């Protein structure tokens, strides 16, 4: 199939998480449909990132207007006719560069942090220069139209998705548990997400300390990375609650689908979440989920059917 659209896909960074998965899947899907896609990242990604043709322009700290001219050059060189930018600074620089060349920009908002949806100079400029706006959930759509005052007719919702494979069987679960060296009779809880407070790991640990008095065969595995202070804070809480025997920090994993298949329950009581692609991935593995009734999670979990929704920052629940 001949290329019909030439697209710049632009992202600020490529840490592990839903935004990176969505960025990569979008590129793959567009290419499979015969479109030309130029992927661009404004920071050097980790070695595990594998996106063919990825270009990098490293953004300096603070506002860096030279990026507008660098992006403009790429747009002209590659004859781009539409820009898709993910998150605020990518949207800012790309939309201005595109506007100067008559190229329209679609801006997708992924942020969980509610502060990113407050009126400010950057968001005002994005509104001026971008053409269409995408929210990853209806919850975030309301922030675009009510907080940022973006025109409703230019705002859209596109949920994230994942590939649905075969539902795990007892045999496949036993096999992957053996591979991951997880006892077959262990009640395995799993969390996947960076170690920042916003993901609610501290609440999971507090709840676990209450559960082990009833069932000492429970073990929590936490997959994800974080800053040194974040790691230290959670490790200190594990020691304070005397959970050393019941918690394993896995660090960053590249085989999260295996851990999801192995677990009995996926648990992540996020303080805030724009969408929560990992909950979709857990559902695709037919796993019950314990999550919080915040952000886009409410659009994924069916209470009492596919999981439980609890209030945020309420481990006693």
Positions of PLM-derived features:
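N-terminal strand-loop element at the rim of the active site
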Residues: 9-66, 228
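A conserved mid-protein helix/loop that constitutes part of the nucleotide-sugar donor-binding site
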Residues: 17-25, 187-210, 232-233, 308, ...
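A conserved nucleotide-sugar
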Residues: 35-38, 183-188, 201, 205-248
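Short His-centered aromatic/hydrophobic patch
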Residues: 85-91, 109
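A conserved, positively charged/aromatic
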Residues: 106-136, 142
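A short helix/loop element that forms part of the nucleotide-sugar donor recognition site in Leloir-type
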Residues: 167-182, 235
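Aromatic "clamp/platform" in nucleotide-sugar-dependent glycosyltransferases that forms part
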Residues: 252, 271
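Short hydrophobic beta-strand element within catalytic cores of glycosyltransferases
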Residues: 288-291, 301
